[in-house]
Amino acid sequence: MTQLLLFLVALLVLGHVPSGRSEFKRCWKGQGACQTYCTRQETYMHLCPDASLCCLSYALKPPPVPKHEYE
């Protein structure tokens, strides 16, 4: 009985397969993450090479470029 329990525990531990996206691809100088969807706390910056979205936290988002008025 003990061996059966040990065998089942070993199967559960060794059989665990992490998801394919456990390591997010990085973008935007390593500060963003390539994801399918951005969360509410993130903003979309550009497309990653695999056509996913580069999501960047609002706290890390660069300030907008000031618009110069042309005469």
From Swiss-Prot:
Gene3D superfamilies: Antimicrobial Peptide, Beta-defensin 2, Chain A
UniProt-listed GO biological process terms: defense response to bacterium; innate immune response
A Pfam family that the UniProt record links to this protein: Defensin_beta_2
InterPro entries xrefs: Beta_defensin_dom
UniProt keywords, alphabetically: Antibiotic, Antimicrobial, Defensin, Disulfide bond, Secreted, Signal
Localization annotation: Secreted
Signal peptide: 1-22
Coiled-coil blocks: none
Source domain of life: Eukaryota
Paired cysteines (S-S): 27-54, 34-48, 38-55
GO cellular component: extracellular region
Cited function: Has antibacterial activity.
PANTHER family the UniProt entry points to: BETA-DEFENSIN 124
Family label: Belongs to the beta-defensin family.
Name by which UniProt lists this protein: Beta-defensin 124
Organism classification: Eukaryota, Metazoa, Chordata, Craniata, Vertebrata
Originating gene: DEFB124
